[in-house]
Amino acid sequence: MGDPFYDCHPAVNFLFFAIVITCSMCLLHPVCLLFSLAGAVWYTARLRGTKALIGYLRWIIPMMAMAALVNPAFVHQGVTLLAYLPSGNPLTLESILYGLAAGCMLGAVALWFSCLSAVMTSDKFIYLFGRVIPALSLVLSMTLRFVPRFKRQFRAVAQAQRYMGRDTANGSLRQRTRNALKVFSIMVTWSLESAIDTADSMRSRGYGEPGRTAFSIYRFDDRDRGLLLWLLFCGAYLLAGALAHGLSFRYYPMLTGAQPQAITVSFFAVYLLLCLTPVGLSLASGHRFRSMEKGGRTV
């Protein structure tokens, strides 16, 4: 059984990622960052698998650690003095915590974008924006397809060159550099030819011409209507919370945030449910499928 959120209408997919990525970048409250990172990790594991998640974390965790270490080295604001660096600049608790928050934000956004690239295929982008902004939608769809295609083609070219005795891992430094440049030249040529072929193909099909019709496999059903209303509610409620400073948190010059009240807790609860929407939809669909299967066996 595939991912139910992937099978939703493209408008629902795009609206969810637009809201959750925007909130992940703008809401730097520690609770919001934790919810966003947890939701991104969980959905990445269900969508791409645990092995792919581990591969992402291998470079996301060092990136988060680097952000946490670099910020205190260059930013010395804050009132909680911990120590003095060898340069004589103060090391403050606020600068360390802000670095950790920035690292969590970068990690969550990176994981959400990885999910976006898997769910929002090129066909969905062209379906949503093909008539309104055909040039931009084509560029976005080509960009989303480019990275995985480039990786597959690079592995194929590198393997072919290795069989021809042009390995980039063996030989002298000069020979390895020459072989690597050869592979790079082949990949650049392939990328340009692929872009030209795609542009010629779309032009020959009348893409972007006024009055052009297109076949669509997407249907906006009751489930999509319910999810769309839910996402609009979450977006409006979180926007109201941000404007009312219910989700605010300041790291400088001292740690200050919204007071823990019932309305503040409701903002956090809505944000948590928003981040867990794809996973919750998958869990509900799996539970319904197992119930139907169990009922069929009973009958």
PLM features: residue spans?
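Transmembrane alpha-helix interface motif
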Residues: 2-45, 156-299
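Short, charged/polar low-complexity linear motifs in solvent-exposed/disordered segments
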Residues: 32-34, 51-52, 143-145
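Membrane-interface helix-boundary motifs at transmembrane edges
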Residues: 46-55
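Juxtamembrane/interface alpha-helical elements of multi-pass membrane proteins
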Residues: 56-174, 290-299
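Membrane-helix interface segments
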Residues: 30, 49-50, 133-136
